[in-house]
Amino acid sequence: MIQDTIRKVVSMQDLAPDEARDLMTSIADGKVTDAQIGSILTALSMKGVTAHEITAFAHVLRDRAVQLKTDTSGTFVDTCGTGGDGAHTFNISTAAALVAAAAGVRVVKHGNRGVSSRSGSADVLEALGIPITLTPEEAAASVSSHNIAFLFAPGYHPAIGRVASARREIGFFSVFNILGPLLNPAGASARLIGVGDTRHIPSITGALANLGVSHAMVVHGDGTDEITITGETEVYELSGGTICRYTLTPEEFGIRRVSRETIAGGSPAENAEIIMDIFSGRKGPCRDIVLLNAAAAIYLGEKATCIYDGYRIAREVVDSGQAYRLVMALRRTT
């Protein structure tokens, strides 16, 4: 009974894997009311979710997702964040994904419109003139021709649509913010995932390992779900089943620390303008933070031996105009 599960979570008890699986199955199959979903999400947020719970939830939702099959093998990278950090930065991970793709990394970016922010990845890509509602066949073709495709979450995860109303009504960070970055329909084997709350880093990293992701960096930078230039970034790197924890600083890359206001964003149109200014050669903090996050994606995509080498490559890609030309090419696919 769903009421028994709610009572267990409310009493701060962790769910066994089979209990978590049954709960998400009931939600995905539409057997749970919005009121019950709201209760579950609230209770899970208060208790905190474990790696095993996240893994079980993700398995259920991935089994129901529209899958993307490509005609190429090898490493695919996704760059995304949990959101909910309240930092109001521009769409850094989206810009970083474009730079990584221009560097030759195959990127399958999975995302949505903004929920807790003014501009989600889908919103800014739309403002850039890049198509966001690709069919699986169109997405596979885009990866083959341009190294990148955007997978609009509602088109690939119909089961998640069943919780949309309840999520809007409760209006706070929930387990679905955590699940989103784990549900890439292409099964991307490498992930750069930003986490807005450090409490979730260990459980997300553990879930990635349980889900078979071979290489990932789970990052939190000075209160944001990005690798930051405003302070230190905490990193959990998963590689070959082993998790290594370390910190990164802007100074390691020759970048001067700045205030968060210098990397603030706005509307989708404003964020698109920031990105195109960067790709057109404008220097400054916004460019620096995009290069730093792109460096991680390039490293994860096996186009660099380390993140420092990835930073050099990202800088060359932007300075040479390759990232700008990629946006122009993607616009022509509409």
Swiss-Prot record:
The gene is trpD. This is Anthranilate phosphoribosyltransferase. Homodimer. Its cofactor is Mg(2+). One of its GO terms (biological process) is L-tryptophan biosynthetic process. Binds 2 magnesium ions per monomer. It is an enzyme of class 2 (transferase). The lineage of its organism: Archaea, Methanobacteriati, Methanobacteriota, Stenosarchaea group, Methanomicrobia. One of its GO terms (cellular component) is cytosol.
